């Protein structure tokens, strides 16, 4: 009966808790019922009673004295201690709480959705009992319980807020699965259609091959029959000639026989012959008289052939005279123009002379660059290397780079630029950034590796994002920002280095990366052409071969530009075309990434050709730089100055100028082309950023 009463007293609060819900009133009811349940607990114990400190009260009894491990006394004492410890039971209050927890857990219905919350309720009650019984620790235990309750409530709210997101994810997962299945079905259908088409084409190819074989056999048969007919006709022709010769011989023999048999041919009448002779002599006399008369009358007459020849000569001389008159008039005009030009040149000379005098009077003297030898690291030898072939402006840049490099070495940290929109993405950081202090060679090698990885990647991201991701992959997430600031400061400083200058221009959006990539492709193509000429793989070719390859590889370059490239490789006026050239050394780079003069000259010509092309485009547009130019007018102007441009290149130029995708450029819709417009200056700046160059000559060859 006591057990039954205890079971009822323990189960009653559980039912009331399930029905109460989560409202504040229900929580109050739950608290009151907990207090009632506490009163109904059998064999109540409180801190005022004697709570057993189990199992600590036996610790003093289990201490063993120092004994020999093999002695009988120690063995007996150990056995007695073990029996004593096994006979010790748990405190009554602990057993009651464990029995209550076990019964409550058995009575729970764990099949509902809130099974875990119900399972937690008995543990709450046990904890409440501890809080009420241990008065000394009640504030601490209450704060612990409240902290856990707050955290559980927060987690429940968070789970409740994430339930719609979970349902949405499930729905999206189902939609994506359906779309994937549909795409796979469509791909399977397309694959089956393509397979059928492939089989049909294979059958058609087999049929055509059979027809080809039959036709070839028929042609061979016809050739044999034609040869036989030709031989037969040759034989018939020869036989016919022989037969005709025999017939002619027979006819001649027959005529001779008929003449010999005809009487009177050889026996002509002498009277008739005398009369005929007399008449013939009279005709001869008359003809002689007429001939003499004609000679007398035609003594002073010029032959017609001579007359025609003289007339022809006269016409040629007349034409030469007219052409000489025209040349004389043209030369006279040119002489007048030259006189005017000479006068204007004299005026300009006087003006420039006066300006020179004024500049010499007011300007400072030319700087003595030898003073920099003692300041630059490396002494006079390094300064001579740096200053070789450079003008004053370039020497100022070199001096600034050397000074900046020293200041850059002294910096241990860079100030962070913040997170503003004007800050590049790879420099957005707040706080000091460590200066890694790499050498110029290390920076150049790092930029080369970045270019190699950029060219090799398939899915292209924006170049600044790629640059920062590359640094993360190379140096890790923690050091990527420090390297980004370090490399940025170095490439911003060393403008005389080609690879640093080009990388800085692409990184800051001043140039597209296609400019650098196409330049490398051009050099690779030129090297391949040179290797194709070097059949012996000796590494050297003649100057004549080098000049020919330059003209074929760069057909749009003028003769003066080809001459500049020849001079850049060491060809001079005294050199002969048979001199040998080590062409592989033209593409070498030093440890700081500096190219040979030949590659530098190629890049300078590329920049000048681009500027000339854009200037020609600007002149052809004939608009103010701040005026708007429509896509239709830009398209027509590009076709006028570059008639051989293909549609793909034209679409790419228009896409770059108007910042629209190349596939959306309306080349065929003139109405849309007339709507899209942009300022001339903006369009030219955007084309200057890209790999813009002439595709063909201004006036194409009529034969092509």
From Swiss-Prot:
Coarse class of the protein's main subcellular location: cytoplasm
Tissues expressing the protein: Specifically expressed in testes. Predominantly detected in the post-meiotic stages of germ cells.
Function: Possible role in spermatogenesis.
Single GO biological process annotation from the record: spermatogenesis
Annotated source species: Mus musculus
Listed name of the protein: Translin-associated factor X-interacting protein 1
UniProt keyword terms in alphabetical order: Coiled coil, Cytoplasm, Developmental protein, Differentiation, Spermatogenesis
Stretch list, region Disordered: 1-37
One Pfam family, short name: TSNAXIP1_N
Cellular compartments annotated: Cytoplasm, Perinuclear region
Coiled-coil region: 190-230, 304-342
A single cellular component GO annotation: cytoplasm
Family matches, as InterPro entries: TSNAXIP1_N
Quaternary structure and interacting proteins, as annotated: Interacts with TSNAX.
